[in-house]
């Protein structure tokens, strides 16, 4: 596994992003504000090709600050649950997504269906892939749940840590081939940094797998090693998936991370080779 070369250092695909630059906020609808980043930028570095991905899944976004004007000019608010297929050509850059959603604020739409259809059309075009959008109206806010990730939390392991550089080699020799298990583990200690701005990205991650039992201390050290790693949320989750398959020989694997929101958006990448995402419920920190 290659983990020394930085695939992003001179990537022209990142040069035009509004992320990390001063920007004006537009209050009237403008689909051109959306910016995509090719998934291949990260996948090439971890030896993945679009034709032979070892997982399926989605980037599950929650938009908490969706607002527009109805036909009479009265402001409306809602939450949007957005799922972007793992097969899309691009991921969507989050600051551009925020700016795009802000452009709805002073724009009239005839009804909520028109808002939903506009979101699907524009996001699908930017991502070059399938997108679904569910709009949650205020009358349903009361049934929105706060949950914990399934499984056993590994964060209480009493370990000493002095190295915070990303290192997948923590997973080397981390399994016991004599113990074949099916278990679900989670951690709230995932932290990485924005690829462009280096701002901290705080997350929780669930790992559900079948295969040789993974040493939990080594797994926790591996997850902590993301602490100073600069990469987008979606890319971190795919990297975790690939590393676990490579080092731990999981026969079945799901990696699901939920990151805290920024700019009214949270991103929750889900990758699995045997199951599909269920209902999206936020965690306490989201």
Swiss-Prot record:
EC number, as in UniProt: 1.7.1.13
Enzyme class (EC, first level): oxidoreductase
Pathway in which the depicted protein is active: tRNA modification; tRNA-queuosine biosynthesis
Positions contributing to substrate binding: 92-94, 233-234
Single GO cellular component term: cytoplasm
Cellular localisation: Cytoplasm
NCBIfam families noted in UniProt: QueF
Name this protein carries in UniProt: NADPH-dependent 7-cyano-7-deazaguanine reductase
Annotated organism of origin: Shewanella sp. (strain MR-4)
């Amino acid at each position: 596994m290659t983990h020394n070369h930085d695939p992003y250092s001179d990537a022209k695909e990142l040069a035009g992003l509004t992320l990390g630059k001063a920007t004006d906020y537009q209050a009237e609808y403008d689909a051109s504000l959306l910016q995509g980043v090719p998934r291949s930028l990260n996948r090439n570095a971890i030896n993945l090709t679009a034709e032979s991905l070892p997982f399926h899944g989605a980037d599950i976004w929650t938009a908490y600050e969706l607002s527009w004007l109805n036909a009479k000019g009265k402001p409306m608010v809602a939450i949007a649950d957005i799922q972007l297929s793992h097969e899309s050509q691009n991921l969507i850059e989050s600051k551009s997504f925020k700016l795009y959603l802000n452009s709805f604020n002073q724009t009239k739409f005839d009804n909520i269906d028109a808002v939903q259809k506009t979101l699907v059309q524009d996001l699908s075009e930017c991502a070059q892939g399938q997108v679904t959008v569910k709009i949650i109206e205020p009358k349903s806010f009361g049934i929105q749940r706060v949950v914990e990730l399934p499984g056993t939390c590994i964060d209480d392991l009493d370990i000493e840590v002095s190295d915070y550089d990303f290192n997948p080699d923590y997973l080397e020799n981390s399994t016991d081939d004599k113990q074949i298990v099916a278990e679900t583990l989670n951690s709230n200690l995932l932290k990485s940094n924005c690829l462009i701005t280096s701002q901290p990205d705080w997350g929780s991650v669930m790992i559900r797998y079948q295969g040789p039992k993974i040493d939990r201390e080594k797994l926790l050290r591996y997850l902590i090693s993301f602490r100073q790693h600069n990469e987008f949320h979606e890319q971190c989750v795919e990297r975790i998936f690939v590393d676990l398959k490579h080092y731990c020989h999981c026969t079945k694997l799901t990696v699901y991370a939920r990151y805290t929101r920024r700019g009214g958006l949270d991103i929750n990448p889900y990758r699995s080779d045997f199951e599909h995402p269920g209902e999206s419920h936020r965690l306490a920190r989201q």
